[in-house]
Amino acid sequence: MATVKVTLIKSVSGRIPNHKLCVKGLGLRRIGHTVEVQDTPENRGMINKAYYMLRVEG
């Protein structure tokens, strides 16, 4: 299955709680942290909710 590289580029401090949970669900812990996640509808939904804090490649 295809993968997507996701990087946290903005802080989760002061954000909507559901968006914080989406970032945590993607496995991101700190600013600049990059993870590779599978390109599934579930992960795409989390990325779409918190898009303004993330950089997505691939």
UniProtKB/Swiss-Prot annotation:
A GO cellular component annotation in the UniProt record: cytosolic large ribosomal subunit
Gene Ontology molecular function: any one: structural constituent of ribosome
Gene3D superfamilies: Ribosomal protein L30, ferredoxin-like fold domain
Keywords (A to Z) from UniProt: Ribonucleoprotein, Ribosomal protein
Lineage top rank: taxon: Bacteria
Subunit structure: Part of the 50S ribosomal subunit.
Family: Belongs to the universal ribosomal protein uL30 family.
Protein name in the entry: Large ribosomal subunit protein uL30
Encoding gene per record: rpmD
